Amino acid sequence: MDNDKYLKGTTTVGVVCTDGIVLASEQRATMGNFIASKTAKKVYQIDDLVAMTTAGSVGDAQQLVRLVNVESQLYKMRRNESMTIKGIATLMSNFLNSNRYYPMMVQLLIGGVDKNGPGIYSLDALGGSIEETRISATGSGSPMAYGVLEDQYREDMTVKEGLDLAIRAIHNATKRDSASGENIDVVVITKEAFRRLDPEEVKSIRASLPK
């Protein structure tokens, strides 16, 4: 299966920092050359301190979000603790692989903070899982995003610095990838809290970037 045929029209980014993680996505949804939405949601909270970004089929992505939300809540009720990020990634990987003959056309980033610290996993449509220890990007704009991430990332980055880098990477992708654009949705997760940035805060950071 050629993932590039389906995993398009999106740029999502994940950055692991010393004190948490940042997940970000632009919000354009396309149908061929038609811009179907300028406010599409692609970053979902799936547990108290875990979130997931989606690239690919909107319907498949929403089904997976519902599934992982239910499974993570059931786990918490039964064990009185949250699933680890690796546990959630493994759950999703197994589910995607079980549907490999009728694959869900998605690519996911699952990230957050658990007892083992901050982390991000990248999953393809067949459930292949790769732990990205520092930076991740998916979607049609990912080559441009990776250009920024690999050039400017530092291992000692704080969440504040990672936030600026993630927005810069998405911003750079939207300038070159016609299927990525509009607003940027950003989530910051530390061991203390899950926070989705206000659109005005994102605009302020974006406006400060070099033209």
Swiss-Prot record:
Which gene name does the record give? psmB
Record-level Gene Ontology MF annotations: threonine-type endopeptidase activity
Which residue windows are coiled coil?
none
Q: Does the keyword Protease apply?
A: yes
Q: What is its main location?
A: cytoplasm
InterPro entries the UniProt entry points to: Ntn_hydrolases_N (IPR029055), Pept_T1A_Psome_bsu_arc (IPR019983), Pept_T1A_subB (IPR000243), Proteasome_bsu_CS (IPR016050), Proteasome_sua/b (IPR001353), Proteasome_suB-type (IPR023333)
The residues of the propeptide are 1-9
What species is given as this protein's source? Methanosarcina barkeri (strain Fusaro / DSM 804)
Q: Which residues cross the membrane?
A: none
Keyword line? Autocatalytic cleavage, Cytoplasm, Hydrolase, Protease, Proteasome, Threonine protease, Zymogen
Report what the protein is called.
Answer: Proteasome subunit beta
